[in-house]
Structure formats: C-alpha cells, structure tokens
Amino acid sequence: MTKIALTIAGSDSGGGAGIQADLKTFAMHRIHGASAITCVTAQNTVGVSQVAGMDISLVKAQIKAVADDLEVNAIKTGMLLNSEIIAAVAQQIEQYRWRQLVVDPVMVSRSGVQL
C-alpha cells in the first residue's frame, strides 16, 4: 500500500522550494504527495519579489478535502506565513489526530529574503 504524505506549505514559482520541492521529495521515496497551499510566492533562483497568503478558509478547505478522501500517514509543514494560518493548521492537525509530523519553520528564503 502506498504511503501518503500531506505537505502544508507555500508554493514556489521557481520550483526549488515549498510545495514543489516537497512533492518531488515524496515522489523520490515512492510516497504519494498531497498538498495544501498556504501562500504563493513570486520567486526564482535570484530572489523573492512577492508573497501572497491564501485565505484561511481555503487553507482549511484544502486540508479537509485531502483528509476526507485520503488516509494521510504523515504531515510536513513549511511556510505557514502568519499566526492565523499557524493556528488553523494546528487545529486541523489536532482534529484529524495526525501524529507523524515534520515541522520545517520556513521564515527566510534561500536568497535571504525574510518571508
């Protein structure tokens, strides 16, 4: 049976970090990757030019959609952007009783930009 991991993080338009990197990593380990996007960044290998947070109701809806359909074996968090998103994600992790959790507190981009 294929293991399922849910990444809850930001989307990197350059593909080198965030949700995109997590999904590539899961695939390399033959783990099915699901995702909930917390924010979208305009970034590339040079830097980050813009960050936009997702509406909390949409973040929660993404997590619920995955939880209602897939048997999630592990959670990985990345850029959660603000305290409201952090609280909403924490509440849902508790609600679904997910215990296999990797927390990657992303606060600064690889290029040094504070997120």
Predicted stretch roles:
Residues A74-T77, L81-L115:
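Conserved beta-alpha-beta core of the PfkB/ribokinase-like small-molecule kinase fold
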Residues M1-A74:
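Small-residue (G/A/S/T)-rich helix-start motifs and N-terminal tracts that mark the onset
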